[in-house]
């Protein structure tokens, strides 16, 4: 796959973020933040994102603009998170990833355990300098820094998320341990051999080329250092010639800003090709978990374990999704929410439905763990 990456205009991106979200946007959280967005900037982000998908909010497969999604993946992903970050925080708090669930384990405990698990496998130690590739709003970085005592640098190409990550780290008293830097993980703004350890949690899926992002991770990791990743990949049961499988995959891609999801073998081959030694490989989605990783997306009230779970899962029932979508549509109609807010919510529902289908068919995992070493020589 050959394509030229776009150049990142850091100042232009920062100015757009301040216009759309406001300079003090980090102090607000969740859907309440949506009421204060600049409506014209929101429309620009919306038109830009859906323009890469033929302006459709559907899981119906459309590959017309796929090459543009590869070349301009940074713009695609940046505007996606301009649009969905508030929705993510509303539904998922500050750690935007899936996890396994132990018996009677709360959502926050399960999320933290998943983060501790990758930190343990990466061998992260106190005082080390660690890179979080695609750090979101900093939830995992905060948790892993507290767990290990490491100094963590979060890399992100979305200014709004960086603003929020800095706010959360300050609020937790971790400003001296955490830094958040604007940058493209396909073109990292760091010299060679900068980090003792590196991890990524469901982030490199946004890359137009896994070989490209892995080569950058390899470049900035110190010789002998470890890289651990939770990767989204298609499993061996996936049949790329099956129309139903194709539709499910496309629903995940359009709903999660993914240029193309790789197969598990392709991702592993990319790690090896850039020079990594794979020292541990583990597919976690069906391992030692009484509940599926998509538990909170499925809307199955029969599996509810607590009243708190009931509130979260009720939102994902058919009637719950309809009520929330209708409310957002009404707020948009009367002008309290920016135009396109319902469209954003609807595309997230497409993603959720597609992820659940993929999980039930066991053709996809969001938690293929690889631990890799960069050779000393």
Swiss-Prot record:
It is an enzyme of class 2 (transferase). It catalyses: lanosterol + S-adenosyl-L-methionine = eburicol + S-adenosyl-L-homocysteine + H(+); eburicol + S-adenosyl-L-methionine = (24Z)-ethylidenelanosterol + S-adenosyl-L-homocysteine + H(+). Pathway: Steroid metabolism. GO terms for cellular component: endoplasmic reticulum; lipid droplet. The keyword Transferase applies. Optimum pH is 7.5. Its EC number is 2.1.1.-. The keyword Methyltransferase applies. It comes from the Eukaryota. One of its GO terms (biological process) is ergosterol biosynthetic process. GO terms for molecular function: identical protein binding; sterol 24-C-methyltransferase activity. Optimum temperature is 37 degrees Celsius. Keywords: Lipid biosynthesis, Lipid metabolism, Methyltransferase, S-adenosyl-L-methionine, Steroid biosynthesis, Steroid metabolism, Sterol biosynthesis, Sterol metabolism, Transferase. Cholesterol is the major sterol found in P.carinii, of which most, if not all, is scavenged from the host. In addition to cholesterol, 41 other sterols have been detected in P.carinii, but ergosterol, the major sterol in higher fungi, is not among them. Belongs to the class I-like SAM-binding methyltransferase superfamily. Erg6/SMT family. This is Sterol 24-C-methyltransferase. It comes from Pneumocystis carinii (strain B80) (Rat pneumocystis pneumonia agent). The gene is erg6.
